Amino acid sequence: MYQAIVFLPLLGCILAGLISLAGARARFPGGEPSEFDHGHGGHESHAAAHDAHGHDAHAHDDHGAHEPAAAGSRFAELATTTLLFISMLLSWLAFVKVGLGQEEFRAPILQFITVGDLKVDWGLRVDTLTAVMLVVVTSISAFVHLYSIGYMEDDPYRPRFFAYLSLFTFSMLMLVTADSLVQLFFGWEGVGLMSYLLIGFWYHKPEANAAAIKAFLVNRVGDFGFSLGIFAVFYLTGAVDFDTIFAQAPALSGKTFHFLSWDLDALTVVCLLLFMGAMGKSAQFLLHTWLPDAMEGPTPVSALIHAATMVTAGVFMVARLSPLFELAPTAQSVVIFIGATTALFAATVGLVQNDIKRIVAYSTCSQLGYMFVAMGVGAYSVGMFHLFTHAFFKALLFLGCGAVIIAMHHEQDIRRMGGLKSRIPFTYWMMFIGTLALTGFPFTAGYFSKDAIIEAAFVGHNPMAIYGFVCTVIAAGLTSFYSWRLMFKTFHGEPHDHHHHEAAHEPHITMLVPLGALATGAILAGMPFKELFTGHGVAEFFRGSLTFAAGNKVLEEMHHVPVWVALTPTVMMALGLLVAWQFYIRRPDIPVALARQYKPLYTFLLNKWYFDELYDFLFVKPAMWIGRTLWKRGDGWLIDGFGPDGVSARVLDVTRNVVRLQTGYLYHYAFAMLIGVAAFITWFMFASGGH
């Protein structure tokens, strides 16, 4: 059963991939033409048509060139989706057997690597932590697959799209079932690669290409630190499998690395390097810049990346390595600081964004910050609880955005929407439920998990915990404001584009069913599981999959916080709702006036704190200058000038000068002969005189 959960998506990928290859060969028997021969021109004309209507081509979720689909496209869709639903059902069964039935599963698959002292076996490790992730990954992926059948119905390359989705899911499943750091790293890099392919799926769009490359490169920065962390763990323990590492972890306390003139605590260094990987993969502060640009990919990709796969990998990794982080309080302080700063930063940026998908993207960034605050204060199960609930309502919001985009003919700017509640009522109510859960409305899924994080931060004993508490409380109010801003500007008020508004309609049934299912999860994923993740049943539920230090009483103390602490998140949620209603329903002139009055602040937030511009100045432009200099000076002038090109140029110079001697005049040749004879006689005389 457990092997089937992991490998069924891989089987679906292979089937869809073969259909995609066959379709490509049938469409282009002589090989795929250049971008100017197919697709690109059609896509440019499609974008130009949007521009002709006065719209920003950047703010559209286009579906690529209009070409006939490959034969077997429907089979590829149905096969991958069916296999994912089977995997989902098996995952829920595994959750019951492992999480509730106290069963654990270990299965070796193959001997992976044997080099010197390094031995890595590829095996499946299914404990409660894994079971939770299996449910999240397969459930969200299954509904994203079903949703994509309707969303991508006009795309001729959908077999390739479904192959990518399934391989993305398999990579994440390989990551969460990993029994060693090396296997986890392969899954880690797999989701990174697949995010690159899916974000850049419409590769004829320059914006999609740029976003894919940006995501790939920013994650390489984090992955470099993650790699160093794995090397350091192997150096300290001589192993990469989790059981050996965790058994030796207590003995590593007090060990140091001597670096330059410093003696650094070994566990702190290791945990910080590993967390650097989590910062990149989970789009935390400083390595967050790729996440909003990832919206250039198809909307189902956004839902899968943000709800169940790539961005949750960092949170899962910290939870899996809780035996190490519990012994490194300084590293935990850094985790809290980065998480809390991310939660607040992303919430402030989300206040003024106008792209419907980017608003939800920044909410993801912010909510991931909440999860890391929980991890930093030692409330690992609470962080996993928020990961679990967040997956349902965040996937719901993204897929709801996709339905809005389809209804508005691929428009994504909320300033051009309005009044859609009457045109797409089902989508409205589904997004309404998702917004309630995101803002933490009482008794929704988000209410139980997000409030628990704030309470855990309040009682945390880490010196940075109070900073986490303050930031998450403020972010709760901001989250409520920008979430309801999105709802009010999209679905309420007067329509701003009457042409698109009149033509708006509900999407295909395959897109509506996932919305309904995820809305159910957004409501019910909280209360039934609250005791397992945050109550007295945590130790029995997670058993050895999470480690809590002897002095870690956060889960117990968080149930005894003052009443004002427990009520603060709800008050902030209500305050954000009231302000948004005042600004965008009752007095829509207020935000316009405030934007004019505080233009520097508004521009600062609109430009995302200028991180893109800062990184462009500090890293991108210098790197481009270095590359251009090495190309022009190093390669062109030095290597080619004194190497192959230089030798050939000198040969040409010599032959050019020799050719000049061939004048064609007889007296020139006679003169040359006389000079030669004279030179010979002179040499002979001197040579003879020497003897």
Give the predicted meaning of each segment.
Residues 63, 68, 97, 101-104, ...:
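Aromatic-capped, Gly/Pro-kinked transmembrane alpha-helices
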Residues 14-21, 143-145, 347-349, 486, ...:
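Alpha-helical transmembrane segments
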Residues 2-12, 76-90, 130-137, 161, ...:
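Hydrophobic alpha-helical transmembrane segments of polytopic
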Residues 1-3, 19-142, 146-163, 236-262, ...:
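Transmembrane helix-loop-helix hairpins at membrane boundaries of multipass inner-membrane proteins
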Residues 1-11, 71-82, 118-136, 174-187, ...:
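Membrane-entry segments of alpha-helical transmembrane domains in multi-pass membrane proteins
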Residues 82-99, 222-235, 431-439, 514-535, ...:
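Hydrophobic alpha-helical membrane-insertion segments
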